[in-house]
């Protein structure tokens, strides 16, 4: 089946698909606070989703392309769930968030198919994969159209991997008590086994969102990057996120001695946002298997336990948390009680001495991850490093911060 036919088949209208903003029905909806964050983007009036321009541009999307798609959504006069929110158009049609971003992805998919140069074709496939992921954002459970966009993203990513430099292998990992999970092993040129970083991504991202991290920061250092999806999304969708948030990553770590391209004696974990919750748990529970753990904007305690902090978080992000926890109909109070159990301090881990070297990078006044969380991580480690990342200029400082973090990881692996 051709890619074009696959797209038509997946998105063929069969019934009235639920609109993304209606999937989580929390009862205590409050006023939307203005939020700006380097890793999560910012709230913009009249949009349900946070607009994450920095990360989308970092992943290779042109700023003008972002504005063009947003303009098509804004200009639509189709029926919306909420007339005040542009990105709530009902049904897979013009103006719907998933439709417009997937349509943009198909443009690049067609370019990729027409391009004779393998590397350029690979770039186009990667671009399409990124756009399909934006279409599926924020990846709420039960969002049928988003799940179809994710399937197209994974197909495009696999096509890109066949053409881009280095080698990428799709790996299947067995997890006792449930379905196996799929990860991607990104390898630089050369002979292995290689030092390896296990990527622990945020709750509103897919494992295929981190190719830029591998290409710009790990591959030049001769380091492999292994990704898996967080519980409840993508290839890990059959697994619910629980207080044992690191369960899937632990089983992957234990399987690494059987992966011939990986030097299982030189492994680090790198966590973005809630992925840092996973990475820090690994630092405590699997310290013999890890040389280092790095975190960026970690969600390990305050956001999970502090009501005032939770009040500053946008509606969409609370919906993501509720969706991952399987609490689609919960009140904010019930969600708060459950989130508190995910705090690594409440679990009795953070605050105890940890032998694993840990670095934590943070931005001042980050609504999702205050400085105190990063200090808690680094002060708990026998070899901790605290890294403040200035906010402006945001893109340059983000790049500089990642260079410093990956350099720190390299010293502990190589």
UniProtKB/Swiss-Prot annotation:
<protein>
    <recommendedName>
        <fullName>Esterase FrsA</fullName>
        <ecNumber>3.1.1.1</ecNumber>
    </recommendedName>
</protein>
<dbReference type="InterPro" id="IPR010520">
    <property type="entry name" value="FrsA-like"/>
</dbReference>
<comment type="function">
    <text>Catalyzes the hydrolysis of esters.</text>
</comment>
<dbReference type="InterPro" id="IPR029058">
    <property type="entry name" value="AB_hydrolase_fold"/>
</dbReference>
<dbReference type="InterPro" id="IPR043423">
    <property type="entry name" value="FrsA"/>
</dbReference>
<keyword id="KW-0719">Serine esterase</keyword>
<dbReference type="Pfam" id="PF06500">
    <property type="entry name" value="FrsA-like"/>
</dbReference>
<dbReference type="InterPro" id="IPR050261">
    <property type="entry name" value="FrsA_esterase"/>
</dbReference>
<comment type="similarity">
    <text>Belongs to the FrsA family.</text>
</comment>
<dbReference type="GO" id="GO:0106435">
    <property type="term" value="F:carboxylesterase activity"/>
</dbReference>
<keyword id="KW-0378">Hydrolase</keyword>
């Amino acid at each position: 089946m051709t890619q074009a036919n696959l797209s038509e088949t997946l998105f063929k209208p069969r019934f009235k698909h639920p609109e993304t903003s209606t999937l989580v029905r929390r009862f205590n909806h409050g006023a939307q606070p203005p939020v700006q964050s380097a890793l999560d983007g910012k709230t913009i009036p009249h949009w349900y989703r946070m607009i994450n321009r920095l990360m989308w541009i970092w992943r290779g999307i042109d700023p003008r392309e972002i504005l063009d798609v947003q303009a098509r959504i804004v200009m639509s006069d189709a029926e919306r769930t909420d007339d005040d929110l542009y990105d709530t158009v009902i049904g897979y049609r013009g103006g719907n968030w998933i439709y417009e971003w997937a349509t943009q992805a198909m443009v690049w998919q067609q370019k990729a198919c027409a391009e004779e140069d393998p590397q350029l074709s690979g770039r186009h496939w990667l671009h399409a994969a990124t756009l399909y992921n934006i279409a599926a954002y924020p990846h709420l459970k039960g969002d049928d159209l988003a799940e179809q966009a994710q399937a197209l993203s994974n197909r495009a990513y696999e096509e890109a991997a066949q053409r881009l430099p280095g080698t990428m292998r799709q790996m299947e990992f067995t997890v006792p008590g449930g379905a196996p999970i799929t990860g991607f092993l990104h390898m630089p040129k050369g002979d292995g086994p290689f030092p390896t970083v296990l990527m622990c991504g945020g709750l509103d991202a897919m494992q295929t969102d981190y190719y830029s991290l591998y290409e710009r920061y790990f591959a030049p250092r001769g380091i492999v990057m292994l990704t898996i999806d967080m519980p409840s999304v993508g290839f890990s969708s059959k697994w619910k996120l629980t207080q044992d948030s690191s369960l899937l990553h632990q089983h992957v770590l234990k399987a690494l001695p059987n992966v011939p391209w990986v030097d299982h004696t030189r492994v680090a974990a790198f966590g973005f946002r809630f992925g840092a919750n996973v990475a820090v748990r690994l630092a405590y529970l699997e310290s013999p298997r890890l040389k280092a753990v790095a975190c960026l904007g970690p969600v390990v305690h305050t956001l999970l336990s502090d009501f005032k902090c939770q009040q500053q978080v946008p509606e969409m992000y609370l919906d993501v948390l509720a969706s991952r926890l399987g609490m689609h109909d919960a009140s904010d109070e019930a969600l708060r009680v459950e989130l508190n159990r995910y705090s690594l301090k409440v679990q009795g881990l953070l605050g105890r001495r940890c032998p694993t070297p840990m670095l934590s990078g943070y931005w001042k006044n980050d609504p999702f991850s205050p400085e105190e969380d990063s200090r808690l991580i680094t002060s708990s480690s026998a070899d901790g490093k605290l890294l403040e990342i200035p906010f402006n200029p945001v893109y340059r400082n983000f790049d500089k911060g990642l260079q410093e973090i990956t350099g720190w990881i390299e010293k502990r692996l190589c």
